[in-house]
């Protein structure tokens, strides 16, 4: 299998998000990289599902709550940006204060 650097990066995000979800399912609170991985993976999948940029930006604030993450993590993540592929091309999606 030959993957471009961009495809390798997306795969790494998915693997990190999967590990984070398994830890979350065991009742663990997420750390910074785990929270960012889950949010990023969900945003990429929403774009793949055909949602608009505006819908994804709104959805991005509902993925995790303060109760899902370790103390202080929500305050560390001011925004998450991801280049997502849409039917009409690649666009930068920014979610401000994603953990509420």
UniProtKB/Swiss-Prot annotation:
SUPFAM superfamilies: Urease, gamma-subunit. Its EC number is 3.5.1.5. Pfam families: Urease_gamma. It is found in: Cytoplasm. Keywords: Cytoplasm, Hydrolase. GO terms for molecular function: nickel cation binding; urease activity. Signal peptide: none annotated. One of its GO terms (biological process) is urea catabolic process. One of its GO terms (cellular component) is cytoplasm. Pathway: Nitrogen metabolism; urea degradation; CO(2) and NH(3) from urea (urease route): step 1/1. The keyword Hydrolase applies. Coiled coil: none annotated. PANTHER family: UREASE. Heterotrimer of UreA (gamma), UreB (beta) and UreC (alpha) subunits. Three heterotrimers associate to form the active enzyme. NCBIfam families: PRK13241.1, urease_gam. This is Urease subunit gamma. It comes from Herpetosiphon aurantiacus (strain ATCC 23779 / DSM 785 / 114-95). The gene is ureA.
